[in-house]
Amino acid sequence: MTGSPRAPHQEHALGEPTVEGLARYIREKDVRRILVLVGAGASVAAGIPDFRSSDTGIYAKLGKYNLDDPTDAFSLTLLREKPEIFYSIARELNLWPGHFQPTAVHHFIRLLQDEGRLLRCCTQNIDGLEKAAGVSPELLVEAHGSFAAAACIECHTPFSIEQNYLEAMSGTVSRCSTCGGIVKPNVVFFGENLPDAFFDALHHDAPIAELVIIIGTSMQVHPFALLPCVVPKSIPRVLMNRERVGGLLFRFPDDPLDTIHDDAVAKEGRSSSSQSRSPSASARREEGGTEDGSSSPNEEVEDASTSSSSDGYGQYGDYYAHPDVCRDVFFRGDCQENVLKLAECLGLREALAKRMRFSGAAPATARKTSNET
């Protein structure tokens, strides 16, 4: 099965909520503004672990550090106190450029760019594989940063990423030559602001998107998870994942039409185990302030994008005001296989295979693909 079956007498924005129907919709509507949202599931086939898988995820392997919360490993507070923990994790992951190859998902995004159909690719991943696949920097938002550059966390002086890599691999914590502060790759820690490019995408790209394709993410990290909530309510939203995510954010064709969206349901959805990166309540030591207790410059952004926000779930109620049309579709399973199928239906399978052969890309089924980041 390539999609969710439709409820009786229910129309779908794609016409037919299948991979074939999605490809037909893209061709017939000549969709030119596709917003692609990418999570860790897209990179697991390259050999990079995700964060939340119960046995193989990064968080599952942090028990030896005796952390109160696994996300603390990626907080500035712990980095200042015990930088060796982050550097040990970074050394194990080895996400500095050149150590992993893009997967079919990454090359498919590049093909969307080449076809003139990519509005923007927003990725939660810090592995740089979208860039390695040739996605243009102008069309790429690395919302949580990457290992392509490094800087001091105190004075922000740039630091050689090559030196940072060599020192990390030798077991040394990189230090700033200007102020002696700790150096880290330019990845966004919990408690740090996301790049301006993310908010440009949130406020300017998402509202004009014609189609959203969400690949391999748990939809648990905010404000990234807000992106599907602010796209036009008339456009299709496609989820490619091993498991259903997003709670009440989505209504798929096989969902019951009589689902009640009331305050109790919304409250249940909002209380799910979400994480926020901009800034993070868990990373702050005093409520209402930043790490050092000062007022957060992005308090309004936080209020609108953390797990306590109702923005994403309130939109679900709009569907049931118009229950005759469904716009969401869920392609359950390996996101690599689903992307290969979509490429074939779009007539791009040969081009995708050529790109993968040329770049030495990771095989689409090299490893069981995770559903989240």
From Swiss-Prot:
Binding-site residues for NAD(+), renumbered to this chain: 39-59, 124-127, 216-218, 241-243, 335
Superkingdom of source: Eukaryota
UniProt catalytic activity: N(6)-acetyl-L-lysyl-[protein] + NAD(+) + H2O = 2''-O-acetyl-ADP-D-ribose + nicotinamide + L-lysyl-[protein]
Record-level GO cellular component terms: cytoskeleton; cytosol; nucleus
Compartments in which it is found: Nucleus
A Pfam family reported for this protein in Swiss-Prot or TrEMBL: SIR2
PROSITE patterns according to UniProt: SIRTUIN
E.C. code: 2.3.1.286
Positions with a binding annotation for Zn(2+): C152, C155, C176, C179
Obligatory cofactor(s): Zn(2+)
Single Gene Ontology BP annotation: B cell activation
Keywords carried by this UniProt record: Metal-binding, NAD, Nucleus, Repressor, Transcription, Transcription regulation, Transferase, Zinc
MF GO annotations: histone deacetylase activity; histone deacetylase activity, NAD-dependent; metal ion binding; NAD+ binding; NAD+ poly-ADP-ribosyltransferase activity; NAD-dependent protein lysine deacetylase activity; tubulin deacetylase activity
Biased composition (Low complexity): 271-282
InterPro entries: DHS-like_NAD/FAD-binding_dom, NAD-dep_sirtuin_deacylases, Sirtuin, Sirtuin_cat_small_dom_sf, Sirtuin_class_I, Ssirtuin_cat_dom
Domain Deacetylase sirtuin-type: residue ranges: 12-349
Cofactor note: Binds 1 zinc ion per subunit.
Active site: H144
Disordered, as annotated region: 263-313
Family to which the UniProt record says this protein belongs: Belongs to the sirtuin family. Class I subfamily.
Entry function: NAD-dependent deacetylase, which probably acts as a regulator of gene expression believed to help form modified chromatin structures on the genes it regulates.
This protein's name: NAD-dependent protein deacetylase SIR2rp1
Organism of this sequence: Leishmania major
GN (gene name): SIR2rp1
